């Protein structure tokens, strides 16, 4: 946050740390936003968790942990914020899925299952919210360089920059009210890892 305030000294930034994998904290965060008189124009559901493993041998509780973070966080936060968006008949929701939402891969067991579920949530939400002029975009990024890759040995130039994904979300959010990018698929130029 310090970096944002330094880079953009004229903006007002408020932050509230919450563990969105917990239903009560996700709901409380949504109410905090609404109680601070924020009109949510764009919601990016980006809470995520990855625990590698195969379905047959991953740690006990891995599926539950990833469903809690990767699906339920978006579900519970969105449900709190939707009534105000529906009343205004405007808004744009971005759900951060993954290439793992579209195809299975080795060592992706529970993670892939949770992201497939988030894709289903996103598709249903898009259908339900059309009458309210609320757009829903599902984002399917491949590998993007974040801190979690810093000790992986992977050359940062081999995978996407996180800013590439942010730029696509911003671009999609700037379209006219009549246009909705339903899905964004982004992959490293050299292909998936």
Where are these regions (language model features)?
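Substrate-binding pocket helix/loop in short-chain dehydrogenase/reductase
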Residues: 54-55, 62-67
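C-terminal helical subdomain
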Residues: 131-134, 138, 154-193
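Active-site loop immediately N-terminal to the catalytic Tyr-X3-Lys motif
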Residues: 56, 105-109
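Active-site helix of classical SDR
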Residues: 78, 114
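Conserved NAD(P)H cofactor-binding loop of Rossmann-fold oxidoreductase domains
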Residues: 46-51
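Residue(s) in the substrate-gating loop at a strand-loop-helix junction
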Residues: 98
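The beta1-alpha1 cofactor-binding region of Rossmann-like NAD(H)/NADP(H)-dependent oxidoreductases
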Residues: 17-28, 60
């Amino acid at each position: 946050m310090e970096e944002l305030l330094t880079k953009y000294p004229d903006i007002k930034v408020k932050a509230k740390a919450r563990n969105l994998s917990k239903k009560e904290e996700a709901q409380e965060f949504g109410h905090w936003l609404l109680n601070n008189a924020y009109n949510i124009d764009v919601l990016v559901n980006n809470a995520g968790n990855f625990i590698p493993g195969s379905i047959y041998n991953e740690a006990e509780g891995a599926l539950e942990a990833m469903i809690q973070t990767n699906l339920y966080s978006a579900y519970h936060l969105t449900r709190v914020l939707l009534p105000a968006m529906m009343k205004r008949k405007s808004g744009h929701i971005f759900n951060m899925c993954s290439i793992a939402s579209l195809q299975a891969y080795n060592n992706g067991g529970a993670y892939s299952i949770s992201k497939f579920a988030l894709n289903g949530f996103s598709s249903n939400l898009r259908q339900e919210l059309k009458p309210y002029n609320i757009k829903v975009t599902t984002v399917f990024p491949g590998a993007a360089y974040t801190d979690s890759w810093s000790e992986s040995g992977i050359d940062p130039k081999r995978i996407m920059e996180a800013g590439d994904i942010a730029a696509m979300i911003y671009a999609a959010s700037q379209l006219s009210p009549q246009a909705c990018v339903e899905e964004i698929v982004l992959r490293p130029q050299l292909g998936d890892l």
